[in-house]
């Protein structure tokens, strides 16, 4: 059954805008999201700590009752944090300090030997790894070579497509990627730029297990509250009115 992972990074972004306060608390947001039916909580601990802090992930690990997906760069520092934290799984993502948000998928094919070691290090300690990648055949094959349990398909090009034809073409690329991933024995998640109005076609892709969504839910939560925003996204994923 398709599940929803709620990304709470943007709650921390608002908090960090006023660095002397502790509000809003992403921990409270995670609790409300779970109460509303979220199947998992996602948090990205970036190297520059621009939003989520180590304090946040440490408390989340103790309080999340569904599962905790820690997004992080494949650096020595972050691997050590993950090994100590022991999240339910880790999603490895690329990072550039100048980007506003993650702009593309991980180049697994170009960094295969290094990522082989990172994946082995984490999974040998019973922390499943997901690789955030573009829907590209070479990246899919390289991801399978690492031994990672999951991939997370980057849906940004689909979400940001300027025309309906472009969006249909990007959706087709995602569908092909799903078919290849299943043939390679990879489990499939997806995320980036998904909204209440574009999520359903991605939710219907073959083998899709979890969608990780943050900005759209948090934007709506400002207007209608966290619990309603999460419930409505679950309905949108099913193609039901909300």
Curated annotation (Swiss-Prot):
Residues forming the catalytic site: 44 (proton acceptor), 71 (proton acceptor), 192 (proton donor)
Residues holding 1-deoxy-D-xylulose 5-phosphate: 9-10, 46, 51, 101
SUPFAM superfamilies in UniProt: Pyridoxine 5'-phosphate synthase (SSF63892)
A single Gene Ontology CC term: cytosol
E.C. designation(s): 2.6.99.2
Catalyses which reaction(s): 3-amino-2-oxopropyl phosphate + 1-deoxy-D-xylulose 5-phosphate = pyridoxine 5'-phosphate + phosphate + 2 H2O + H(+)
Pfam families membership: PdxJ (PF03740)
Biological pathway: Cofactor biosynthesis; pyridoxine 5'-phosphate biosynthesis; pyridoxine 5'-phosphate from D-erythrose 4-phosphate: step 5/5
Compartments where located: Cytoplasm
CDD domains cross-referenced by the UniProt entry: PNPsynthase
Residues of the site described as Transition state stabilizer: 152
Keywords assigned: Cytoplasm, Pyridoxine biosynthesis, Transferase
MF (Gene Ontology): pyridoxine 5'-phosphate synthase activity
GO biological process: pyridoxine biosynthetic process
Presence of the UniProt keyword Cytoplasm in the record: yes
Disulfide bonds: none
Residues reported to bind 3-amino-2-oxopropyl phosphate: 7, 18, 193, 214-215
Subunit annotation: Homooctamer; tetramer of dimers.
UniProt record similarity statement: Belongs to the PNP synthase family.
Biological role: Catalyzes the complicated ring closure reaction between the two acyclic compounds 1-deoxy-D-xylulose-5-phosphate (DXP) and 3-amino-2-oxopropyl phosphate (1-amino-acetone-3-phosphate or AAP) to form pyridoxine 5'-phosphate (PNP) and inorganic phosphate.
Protein name per its UniProtKB record: Pyridoxine 5'-phosphate synthase
Protein species of origin: Synechocystis sp. (strain ATCC 27184 / PCC 6803 / Kazusa)
């Amino acid at each position: 059954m398709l599940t929803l992972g709620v990304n709470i990074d943007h709650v921390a972004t608002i908090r960090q805008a006023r660095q002397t306060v502790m509000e809003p608390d992403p921990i409270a947001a995670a609790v409300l999201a779970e109460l509303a039916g979220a199947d998992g909580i996602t948090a990205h601990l970036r190297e520059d700590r621009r939003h989520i802090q180590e304090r946040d992930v440490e408390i989340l690990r103790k309080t999340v009752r569904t599962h905790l997906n820690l997004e992080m760069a494949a650096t020595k520092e972050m691997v050590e944090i993950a090994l100590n934290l022991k999240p339910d799984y880790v999603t490895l993502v690329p990072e550039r300090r100048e980007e506003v948000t993650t702009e593309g998928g991980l180049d697994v094919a170009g960094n295969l030997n290094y990522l082989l070691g990172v994946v082995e290090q984490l999974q040998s300690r019973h922390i499943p790894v997901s690789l955030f990648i573009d829907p590209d055949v070479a990246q899919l094959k390289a991801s399978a070579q690492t031994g990672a349990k999951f991939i997370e398909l980057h849906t940004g090009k689909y979400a940001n497509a300027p025309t309906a034809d472009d969006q249909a073409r990007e959706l087709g690329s995602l569908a092909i990627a799903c078919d290849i991933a299943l043939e390679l024995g990879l489990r499939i998640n997806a995320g980036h730029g998904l909204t209440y109005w574009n999520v359903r076609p991605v939710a219907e892709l073959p083998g899709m297990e979890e969608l990780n969504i943050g900005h759209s839910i948090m934007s709506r939560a400002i207007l209608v509250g966290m619990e309603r925003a999460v419930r409505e996204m679950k309905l949108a994923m099913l193609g039901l009115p909300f």
